[in-house]
Amino acid sequence: GLAAFDDLPTYGHESLEAALQADQVAAEAADLGFDPEELRAPNRPLALARMIDLGDRHVEIVHFGPGHTAGDVVVIVPDADVIVTGDLYEQSAPPAMGADCHLKAWPVALDGILGLVNERTLLVPGHGEPFDRVFAFTQRAEISAVYGQVEYLIAQGVKLDDALKTGEWQYDDDTIAAVLPIAFAQLAAEGKVPRPKLRLL
């Protein structure tokens, strides 16, 4: 999409340039009928934050850390008390927790958003209708609970194949079945794997 705006300032996290070089991204672009060579990273990359002056108002673009992906950014409109969260939040369905998500860090990124929210703030998600801080706190707890439950099951020696039926989940079976291999792999990378429990005689 950004190739169409080469002559305009485009903003995004600095990690996008490397992400666009991934074989999976090239394959997905080809499947959609796009030439992978035409993919463009933002020409105004940011690491943490950038303020943009629009004349009669300014907006802030902030990276609170990895979550839905490594490079999620949030757009804050202070004078309107609006925060555009992108896919860090989803209202119309459970959050998409794909292979490029960061389950452990995701709630921390949401904490950055929640620190800016008051009873009047309107939050605009990546998918669905705008929502308020009650929804924002609830979904933050749900995402955190997914990682926490998998971590608990692994500590109890529960293997991937048994996790869906053994755990207590906030989301539907299809959502959890899709994220479980990702969660187990991310925890395995931290050295957390199911180990058999010794029986006490």
Model-derived segments and spans:
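Accessory terminal helices/loops
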Residues: 115-120, 130-201
